[in-house]
Amino acid sequence: MKQEIIDRFTRYAKVDTQSTEASNTVPTTEGQLELGRILVEELKALGLTEVTMDDNGYVMATLESNTNKEVPTIGFLAHLDTATEFTGKNVNPQVHEYNGGDIELGHGYVLSPKQFPELAGYEGHTLITTDGTTLLGADDKAGIAEIMTAMDYLIKHPEIEHGKIRVAFTPDEEIGRGPAHFDVDAFGAAFAYTLDGGPLGQFQYESFNAAAAKVSFYGVSTHPGTAKNKMVNAIKRAIEFHSQLPANEAPEFTEGYEGFYHLLSMEGNADFAELHYIIRDFDRQQFANRKAKMEAIAWEMQEKHGKGKVSIELRDQYYNMREKIEPQKEIVEVALEAMEKLGIDPKVGPIRGGTDGSQLSYKGLPTPNIFTGGENYHGRYEYVSVDNMEKAVHVIVNIANLVAQRAK
């Protein structure tokens, strides 16, 4: 199975599927459609039915039930796109039999346990890394490879009882648009799981409440030599705004259940400047308070500098899926039992981020998140353990079987 996983993953990783905020098309990039078409053909070749890809790039397929029991339909999902933070073009995956120490990625870059201490725990594993020039795309092509391999395994092992299984691969998850055009009714599952987590055993059914903010500043540009009492520097107004947010409530200073404000980008000149933020908090009231604080700062600056000099736009992105999953704890219990049967110690904790499941849970499809085996996502030091990918495959298989066993 390991070689199948390696072959699938490296094949998918080589397709450039980075999404982009700059596009309003669905999906936002052609590469996602390219990978979707590849998966459609592979799903058909495996023997799945009802294989579709719609105009928006959503791929869906069915593995039919092999039992006469009335088993609820379950789903497994992963996303097609890779992150925007680092290039995903010309990905060249490297396979290593890791025996400890540093890994030479190439181009002068080294993956070292001195910088990434968790690497030492992977001694004896088969690892896939980058060549140092791109991200790897294990987020979330590891999840795609695991779902595909699990479906193949179930087809080849008809003695493993399971109900109807739906799989889906979604575009634009990394920019928060994954579920925007996802047809929950057409998918037809009672509940689902995303394969979009990190290290072995990770299981998550709590996510941030999330919003985006755009703050605009309007200045007056004049020649700096004759600017006295005339120039209004919009960049300085932007700095003034940012300085009023709590400095210690940023990603680099927070962990666990702590929320934050994150300045994603700053652009502009003396005439006009713009700040782009994301706002995150697990608690719904604290989330509301954070948004209110940003609005209050903008309002105070309006009062100080004049109307029309500062504007703010806030947009909610997704909410904490715990509110939708906790009432159906059997979804969690089945996944944890599936891991424990493999000797995996489940590591249940919050996602300091979001998945497609965050939004899908609010669209009527409760969807917690399962590990894929990857580390250091979104950069050149990203890697994934093939050994732990294989365990993720068996978690999928066990979930399908346990749901069938629990049915009458």
UniProtKB/Swiss-Prot annotation:
GO cellular component terms, semicolon-separated: cytosol
Cellular compartment(s): Cytoplasm
One GO molecular-function entry: zinc ion binding
Main EC class the enzyme belongs to: hydrolase
Bound cofactor: record note: Binds 2 Zn(2+) ions per subunit.
Record key words, sorted: Aminopeptidase, Cytoplasm, Hydrolase, Metal-binding, Metalloprotease, Protease, Zinc
EC number(s) on file: 3.4.11.4
Gene3D superfamilies: 3.30.70.360, Zn peptidases (3.40.630.10)
CDD domains: M20_peptT
Name of one Pfam family that matches: M20_dimer
Residues binding Zn(2+) 2: 139, 174, 378
Reactions it catalyzes: Release of the N-terminal residue from a tripeptide
Family annotation (InterPro entries): ArgE/DapE_CS, Bact_exopeptidase_dim_dom, Peptidase_M20, Peptidase_M20_dimer, Peptidase_M20B
Membrane-spanning intervals of the chain: none
Principal location class: cytoplasm
Record GO biological process: peptide catabolic process; proteolysis
Active site: 81, 173 (proton acceptor)
Intrachain S-S bonds: none
Cofactor(s) the record lists: Zn(2+)
Keyword Phosphoprotein: no
Amino-acid positions noted as binding Zn(2+) 1 in the UniProt annotation, renumbered to this chain: 79, 139, 196
Family listed: Belongs to the peptidase M20B family.
Described function: Cleaves the N-terminal amino acid of tripeptides.
Protein name as catalogued: Peptidase T
Species whose genome carries this gene: Shouchella clausii (strain KSM-K16)
